[in-house]
Every structure is written in structure tokens, then in C-alpha cells.
Design a protein with these regions (language model features):
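Membrane helical hairpin/interfacial module
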Residues: 1-9
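Long, contiguous internal "core" modules enriched in hydrophobic/ aromatic residues
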Residues: 9-206
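Surface-exposed loop/turn and secondary-structure junction residues enriched for glycine/proline
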Residues: 51, 214-215
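Short, function-defining helix-loop hinge/capping sites that tune catalysis or transport
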Residues: 115, 215-216
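N-terminal signal-anchor module of multipass membrane proteins
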Residues: 201, 213-214
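Membrane-proximal cytoplasmic C-terminal regulatory module of class A 7TM GPCRs
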Residues: 216-225
């Protein structure tokens, strides 16, 4: 619903900018579209944050991460448009730098949290046999992989996850922020912003993949995971 409400002012802003330029009415409609865009991102984040069986999503870090990633990627696209349209990144480059560093800090805090968070349940507590000591399954519920294991029980080695996290930090946040800063200072803005945008797209793709790959549903306890 939030996304549907956002479309009219967003399209209106684009039309006004094209026809009238950056006048008062255009600015007001643009601010409304931006505010509704943030509301849409927040609603999307809460879809995941409200899923209690998945501890990697059901926490206080999910929504702020979504908001900061949206601000960062939006600032990057704004800088790209300005650089390609006017030949200068200007203050948008500095905005990318600030938003990128904030998003990187939030992402690090999120990873630290899910790495140190205690499991929501154990096989013993899930089966109600906690008072009898250690519990282990005698047999798997299924002989072949099913939807739960395929979508919510993906196993990624810790060393591989750590490597992908480092790649994410470098390509999604640090390098683009540095390139945007240089572009904002007037150093071949268009070329640097295009490169920064491509790096951001690649880094955020890996970040989104990790967000889903590292999530585990409590139902996987019954499969010995």
C-alpha cells in the first residue's frame, strides 16, 4: 500500500521537474515523494523484522539498516544524475560519503549482533524435552531437501561469509564513498560517480544475498541445524 501511495507524487515530481524545473511546487512534491519513499522502505523492513522465527531479521538492527541503505543508494543515484546531467556531483558527493559511512557502521553493528546473539531455541526446548537433557534427532523429517531447508536453512561457511562481508564493505560502502568524495571535490565527477555506482550495485547485491543466506528459521532445528 505504501508503495502505491508513493507512485503519484514520485511521477508528479518527475513530470514537474521536466516541465517546470526546480521551482517551489516541484520541491514540495519532491519532498512528499521522498518522505513516502522512506515510509515504503520502513514498511518493507518491518515485513522482515516482524518474523519472530528468524532471529537474524527479528531484531532492532533490521529497520535502521534498511533505512540507511536506502538513503545511501538514493544519494548515490542522485549524485549519478547530477554528474551526468551537469558534469558536477557537488554536495551530493559529500552526501554519499556521509550516508555510506553511516550505512557501513550500521551494517557492521548488525553483523556483530547476529554473530553474538543467542539462539531463540534449541532442539530440546522446541520439543519440550529440555528437562531431560540433551536432545538429538534419530532421523531427519525428510529424505530429500524441502522448501524449509532450501529457503530458510541455507548453510554458508563462516570463512566464506566473512570474506563476502569484507567484499561488501569495500565495494558497497568504502570505495564508493571515497570515489564520491573525490567527485564532489571536482575530480572527473561523471567518471568517478559512474564507477562508484557500479561498485555500489555489486556490493549491495552481495549484501542482500548475505541477508537472506545467513537467515535461519527455527524450524531447521528439527533437521539438526
Amino acid at each position: 500500500m505504501a508503495s502505491l501511495v508513493t507512485f503519484p507524487p514520485a511521477l508528479g515530481f518527475a513530470a514537474l521537474w521536466w516541465v517546470m524545473g526546480p521551482g517551489p511546487v516541484t520541491v514540495i512534491v519532491g519532498l512528499i515523494a521522498a518522505a513516502l519513499g522512506l515510509v515504503t522502505v520502513y514498511c518493507t523492513a518491518m515485513i522482515y523484522a516482524s518474523l519472530k522465527p528468524i532471529r537474524q531479521w527479528n531484531n532492532k538492527h533490521t529497520a535502521p539498516n534498511y533505512m540507511l541503505l536506502a538513503l545511501f543508494s538514493g544519494a548515490m543515484l542522485l549524485a549519478l544524475l547530477l554528474a551526468c546531467w551537469t558534469g558536477q556531483a557537488g554536495l551530493a558527493g559529500l552526501l554519499v560519503l556521509v550516508a555510506g559511512l553511516l550505512a557501513a557502521a550500521a551494517k557492521l553493528a548488525y553483523w556483530r549482533f547476529i554473530d553474538t546473539q543467542k539462539p531463540l531455541a534449541t532442539l530440546a526446548s522446541a520439543t519440550g524435552l529440555k528437562e531431560y537433557g540433551a536432545v538429538r534427532p534419530l532421523d531427519a523429517p525428510h529424505f530429500t531437501e524441502n522448501y524449509v531447508l532450501r529457503e530458510m536453512g541455507y548453510q554458508i561457511a563462516r570463512k566464506h561469509a566473512a570474506k563476502l562481508r569484507r567484499i561488501t564493505l569495500a565495494t558497497a560502502f568504502l570505495l564508493p564513498a571515497l570515489l564520491a568524495l573525490l567527485a564532489g571535490l571536482g575530480l572527473v565527477p561523471a567518471l568517478l560517480i559512474i564507477l562508484a555506482t557500479l561498485l555500489t550495485a555489486m556490493g549491495l547485491f552481495i549484501e542482500r544475498w548475505l541477508f537472506f543466506a545467513e537467515a535461519t528459521h527455527v524450524a531447521t532445528l528439527y533437521y539438526g541445524r
